[in-house]
């Protein structure tokens, strides 16, 4: 990594990972911040606000919740709020304490602003119903940041759920060189092309950082998050993202070439990798089905040993999302 600005950013990230591994009190502090979620007052403000639509960056496509009227109702309400109270949602997102003034852009953080997210016990069930509305709001927030911010570094974070992307963002948000951070899956990179192009066209530097973990470690992290916060991760989504990510990154590298920096962080070893071929080799653990089998083996072992609750197992085995 020869870019001195990027080198400083990665050094900060590496120090953060070392502290997480070596200082239990620091890990507890960071996890407390992560699991706090959006303050209830922000959701209340959105509910009280009047209609204030703004153009959205994309169409919100509803998922099919046939036979599940509760989820269908959650989805309809989320879509209505996203289209009718867009300005209030974006303003609340900027004030969300975990977003660094709105610079950290993540659809999961937008979910915290919807009424269905208020109860932790309901979050795993509500997740899919809020997904598409939150994804479009995240794209809209990214466009707003490009409109109002001076060009800096736009960092795209990706990796299997449970890799530690959101945890890592806490360190990177403190670095003023990072103007925005967009967390999202790049295993199917088509939706990322216009976002990255928009950043480049406005003079921003763009780097993609893939955070890597073994499937088993990622599963342990999502299960821990489920019990602490209510949102875990399905095996289908985890395996699809990890199994397809090397090809997705290769497609992005082929399209943008030297206009972007492609990097990987192995959270298991602490290694930073900036050679595209080495990144592909490190991240390639097999196709989605191979990774799915590893995850199922580990989940079954936890279940057989009595270390897994029925609710945690159910959320890991079910999703409406298709990747």
Each language-model region and where it sits:
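Glycine-rich phosphate-binding loop of ATP-dependent small-molecule kinases
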Residues: 1-323
